[in-house]
């Protein structure tokens, strides 16, 4: 380090430490980027800046990494631990000679030629001092200090003063110089290539972190009104409604004003501070997984479309906060028009929300304006977010997808976007959903409460510790790749006004796949596991030891037979998870001489079905296998596989399960092996039997799927009893029988009486060929499926269903 740098560091030490508050991404680069502290590390930065280097030094010290000022000695040579591509521009006069970064890269590569064991990790680091992207229509100015990408020393000093508290240090995955040297050599041309790659990388990092300039609403409205598509729609509206062109244009402008967001970076910054406080007050923390792959896609220039599940109004705030906190650009969010009330509407709008009506039916001008607005967002490169379920789930299960926004996304892509479009499924989970009581009332038949300021105040008044929140980014789905594989001719239809025939079925398939990938990113926690166990128990009560043992059973199943590489399982043991769940005060706990008993009263049991349903899909197949063994002792492996294959299509559609049919034999084998390892079952005489020592644990596992199988049995036996029944009547009779079962046998799960589930089941029976389009049944297949499902129910449930079918 030069004498000048030492003097600068000494002078700036106190100002920088007082003004700069850095945040690193990822939070643990050693683990998340697989950095090897035992191998030499050299940092690559875009611009030589003493404040950047000092900030990086402090950040590295906090993370346990060698800092840029830490000496690096290799083969007896003392080398700088950082390489910078550019000097800052001078205050006056011409730019001084360039930095010797090519020689430095070449020197590092040449060391690998001399020492075959050497492997230097080059870690690109980007420092952001604020992430305001600017706004369209703003004039570029030399005095625009904050947005300057190459500030001189005076500007940099002002940036540190004004934006030091917003500093973000972004570490990128390391580049192995050993790999580079072995594959490409060590001559000067490779050093040039390395420098070019680094420049491209830093440019993409800047765009991924700040995004394109924010839209200017007035300019945006003018662009929309000047478009040929909207001009034509205005003319058609005037003719259809018998009004003047001026009035029709004013109506179109009103729709734009109703729809369009008014993104404010200042609000995003204030929101980050407020929401950081809110999460600490509301929750014990946030768990975020899978963000790195999304950052990588953004950096590669993908159009990112976030597709989260919808649990709560809190989802809007949570996901935008997490995306910004993870160093990415908050998206424009499609929000229901019901949220456009004061003061939430203006706040959401400044936070990126654009508002959508429940239906476009009967209003072609509104439909055209909305579609063109969405097309413009994509064309300008803004990320977008929409909830494909269309509304919040009242039961904790994923709802059947609404395909409108997905279809419009695909149509926008077919307008000829010049970059890949990637859909990112997002699983949002909570240990407490603040609207869950309201959901229960709505499912009982109460009218949905209209969103209002008073409702917001009511929620804020109840703020308390709600446990943890979970945001898991699932497996991304790049539309271009999907269409290349499934619709090879799709590019031939780019720019066409008419929708191609393949559009509708492709959108439906994409929607199903997205829902499956959302469920594949599920987050397991102590509350959801405890709810699963207690709701499976007789009278919803277990001793604490039994409950803890059951949590162990669930955890071992998830670890030994993972549902998906994107789902997350807690690191804590069963005891710790149970302690955390009990702190949420959702259970009754009593104690006698033998120990604690954990139970649920009737109301708690109903509310906890919501949390159980968040993870029910993870245990659907383990529960089915357990039920087959528990009800059909001595059953063979081949019979288990055959029955699972027979029942699976119904479960797959209802719970958005990820397995294909040809994967089921291998899955069944893995589950049988794990159940034997846990000593829940025994294999003998060519079959599988319940291990009486651990019968309770197997019974609890088997019980989780019972309510689902009961619904299937209701419909199957009803069709067998009345083969000529119409679809609507079958749905109504199924719902009536479910309510009867609930009354007689104390089944309180709200989704047990959910008409949508009966509708989904009948649709699946049609698509699988059990029913023809006119609802005429294939009685042979119905009987075979009923023979596989009905014996898995308890005797009392079977009798009630049989009695109902005789009425």
Curated annotation (Swiss-Prot):
KW Phosphoprotein (keyword) present = no
- GO biological processes: CDP-diacylglycerol biosynthetic process; fatty acid metabolic process
The primary location reported for this protein is membrane
One GO cellular component term of this record is: plasma membrane
Pfam families for this protein: Acyltransferase, GPAT_C
* Domain of life per record: Bacteria
Which pathway does the database say it acts in? Phospholipid metabolism; CDP-diacylglycerol biosynthesis; CDP-diacylglycerol from sn-glycerol 3-phosphate: step 1/3
Disulphide connectivity of cysteines: none
Which top-level enzyme class is recorded in the Swiss-Prot or TrEMBL entry? transferase
The protein's GO terms of the molecular function aspect are: glycerol-3-phosphate O-acyltransferase activity
The record's catalysed reaction(s) read: sn-glycerol 3-phosphate + an acyl-CoA = a 1-acyl-sn-glycero-3-phosphate + CoA
UniProt record similarity statement: Belongs to the GPAT/DAPAT family.
**Protein name (Swiss-Prot/TrEMBL):** Glycerol-3-phosphate acyltransferase
UniProt organism field: Aeromonas hydrophila subsp. hydrophila (strain ATCC 7966 / DSM 30187 / BCRC 13018 / CCUG 14551 / JCM 1027 / KCTC 2358 / NCIMB 9240 / NCTC 8049)
């Amino acid at each position: 380090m030069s004498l000048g740098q030492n003097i600068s560091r000494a002078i700036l030490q106190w100002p920088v430490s007082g003004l700069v508050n850095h945040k690193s991404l990822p939070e643990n680069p050693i683990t998340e980027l697989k950095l090897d502290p035992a191998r030499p590390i050299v940092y690559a930065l875009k611009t030589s800046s003493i404040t950047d280097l000092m900030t990086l030094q402090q950040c590295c010290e906090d993370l346990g990494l060698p800092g840029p000022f830490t000496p690096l000695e290799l083969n007896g040579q003392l080398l700088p631990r950082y390489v910078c591509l550019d000097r800052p521009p001078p205050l006056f006069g011409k730019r001084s000679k360039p930095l010797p970064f090519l020689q430095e890269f070449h020197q590092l590569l040449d060391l690998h030629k001399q020492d075959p064991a050497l492997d230097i990790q080059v870690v690109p680091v980007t420092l952001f001092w604020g992430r305001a992207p600017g706004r369209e229509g703003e004039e570029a100015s030399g005095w625009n200090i904050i947005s300057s990408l190459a500030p001189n020393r005076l500007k940099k000093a002002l940036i540190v003063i004004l934006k030091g508290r917003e500093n973000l240090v972004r570490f990128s995955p390391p580049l192995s110089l050993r790999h580079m040297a072995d594959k490409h050599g060590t001559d000067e041309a490779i050093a040039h290539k390395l420098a070019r790659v680094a420049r491209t990388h830093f440019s993409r990092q800047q765009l991924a972190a700040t995004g394109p300039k924010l839209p200017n609403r007035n300019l945006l409205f003018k662009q929309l009104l000047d478009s040929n598509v909207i001009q034509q729609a205005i003319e058609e509206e005037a003719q259809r409604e018998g009004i003047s062109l001026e009035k029709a244009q004013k109506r179109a402008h009103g729709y734009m004003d109703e729809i369009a967001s008014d993104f404010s970076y200042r609000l995003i910054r204030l929101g980050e501070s407020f929401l950081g406080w809110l999460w600490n007050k509301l929750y014990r923390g946030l768990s975020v997984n899978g963000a790195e792959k999304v950052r990588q896609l953004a950096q590669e220039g993908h159009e990112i479309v976030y597709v989260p599940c919808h649990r709560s109004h809190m989802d809007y705030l949570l996901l935008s906060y997490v995306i910004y906190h993870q160093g990415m650009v908050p998206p424009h969010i499609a929000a229901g028009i019901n949220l456009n009330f004061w003061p939430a509407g203006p706040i959401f709008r400044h936070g990126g929300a654009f508002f959508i009506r429940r239906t476009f039916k009967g209003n072609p001008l509104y439909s055209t304006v909305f579609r063109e607005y969405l097309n413009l967002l994509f064309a300008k490169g803004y990320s977008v977010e929409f909830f494909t379920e269309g509304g919040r789930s009242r039961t904790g299960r994923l709802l059947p997808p609404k395909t409108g926004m997905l279809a419009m996304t695909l149509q926008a892509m077919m307008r000829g976007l010049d970059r890949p479009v990637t859909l990112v499924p997002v699983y949002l989970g909570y240990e407490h959903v603040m609207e869950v009581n309201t959901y229960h009332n709505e499912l009982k038949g109460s009218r949905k409460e209209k969103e209002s300021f008073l409702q917001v105040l009511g929620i804020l008044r109840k703020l308390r510790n709600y446990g943890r929140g979970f945001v898991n980014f699932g497996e991304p789905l790049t539309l271009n790749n999907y269409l290349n594989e499934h619709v090879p001719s799709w590019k031939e239809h780019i720019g066409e006004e008419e929708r191609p025939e393949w559009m509708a079925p492709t959108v439906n398939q994409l929607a199903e796949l997205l829902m499956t990938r959302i469920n594949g990113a599920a987050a397991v926690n102590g509350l959801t596991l405890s709810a699963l166990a207690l709701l499976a128990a007789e009278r919803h009560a277990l001793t604490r030891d039994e409950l803890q043992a059951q949590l162990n059973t669930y955890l071992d199943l998830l670890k030994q037979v993972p549902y998906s590489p994107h789902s997350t399982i807690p690191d804590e043991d069963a005891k710790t998870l149970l302690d955390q769940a009990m702190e949420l005060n959702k259970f009754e706990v009593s104690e006698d001489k033998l120990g604690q008993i954990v139970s649920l009263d009737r109301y708690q049991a109903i509310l906890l079905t919501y949390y159980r349903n968040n993870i029910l899909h993870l245990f659907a197949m383990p529960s089915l296998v357990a039920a087959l063994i528990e009800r059909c002792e001595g059953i063979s492996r081949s019979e288990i596989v055959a029955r699972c294959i027979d029942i699976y299509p119904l479960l797959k559609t209802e719970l958005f399960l990820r397995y294909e049919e040809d994967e089921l034999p291998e899955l069944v084998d893995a589950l049988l092996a794990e159940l034997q390892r846990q000593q829940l079952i025994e294999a003998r005489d060519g079959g599988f039997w319940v291990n009486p020592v651990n019968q309770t644990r197997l019974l609890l596992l088997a019980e989780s799927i019972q309510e689902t199988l009961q619904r299937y049995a209701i419909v199957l036996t009803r069709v067998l009893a009345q083969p000529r029944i119409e679809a609507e009547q079958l749905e109504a009779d199924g719902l009536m029988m479910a309510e009867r079962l609930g009354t007689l046998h104390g089944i309180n799960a709200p989704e047990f009486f959910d008409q949508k589930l009966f509708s989904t089941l009948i649709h699946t029976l049609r698509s699988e060929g059990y029913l023809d389009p006119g609802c005429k049944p294939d009685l042979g297949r119905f009987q075979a499926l009923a023979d596989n499902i009905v014996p898995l129910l308890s005797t009392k449930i079977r009798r009630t269903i049989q009695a109902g079918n005789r009425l």
